[in-house]
């Protein structure tokens, strides 16, 4: 049993959420693949009793089951999770506050989901969807 956010959880059940089942749960860390190590690090980080968790593109190269476990872990995380991600759907499911860099490095703080932030941004700035740039040949 492990302590997870103040409640006792079966350790094998916990790591199985990160796609470690059966004999995978008995592997030594040194023989894990890169993807398995990433899943292990996520599982360990989410179970720590930390105040702040920094995640840089946490949804890159993870499977759907691990993504769901990550979302659940972040929802139950008692501290502050700072997440840098381009995955808008993931952000919409987990974010409660947004710190965004807009335009010429203007920093905007917003309380709410990512969808609510996007709607607010559209109201404030209009349609600022990036446009394809056409380059003009300067030399002959």
Q: Where in this protein do the model-derived segments appear?
A:
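ABC ATP-binding cassette signature C-motif
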Residues: 1-140
